[in-house]
């Protein structure tokens, strides 16, 4: 049975600082819950919402209702949300495409104190594997809802015919984020698994090389795949992010 992933706002009565988490393309808040709970236990308030079109139970919604401009606004709205709740000091981390969006948001919003990108495609080259992963995610969602084979086939055809337009938007965002790297002034965290099947292996390092005037913390995770927040590397990732926050964010 499919259950729609919900936004989370993990509170801590002793917290004075907030962390915004952003999930990846075709992902949801589920991918960020382990990290969110960990950071809550360390004394932070943590907020994560689903990007528009995500987490609805209908993958076509990502294409119909989503888009880069909407998702950038979702990230800004998340910062406003925690500030409206009284937390003025904010850090931001994103996974995969969420990492690109977090980076772009930090380039534009200098009052975000620090943040980073986890498994982010700073080198974005689309392959058939990307499309198959997207269709695979969609079919997993449809099967969980017991959709008919005829309906799934029809929906798959729609996704294949329309995803490339959004891929072009993502490619443009990646290019602009790389070009805007000089605007980034905050301490920055980068993470990538050495067995990441979705990324070019030089992805994180390529962006690190653009940040000559920024304090950068860069970690690799041996034999770890793409979704570092939930795979076998998640404990190491959590502790590395905590150390980064202790150095750059903790009062």
Protein language model features and the residues they cover:
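Short beta-strand/loop motif that positions the catalytic acidic residue
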Residues: 184, 190-192, 196
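Catalytic nucleophile-loop/oxyanion-hole region of alpha/beta-hydrolase
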Residues: 57-87
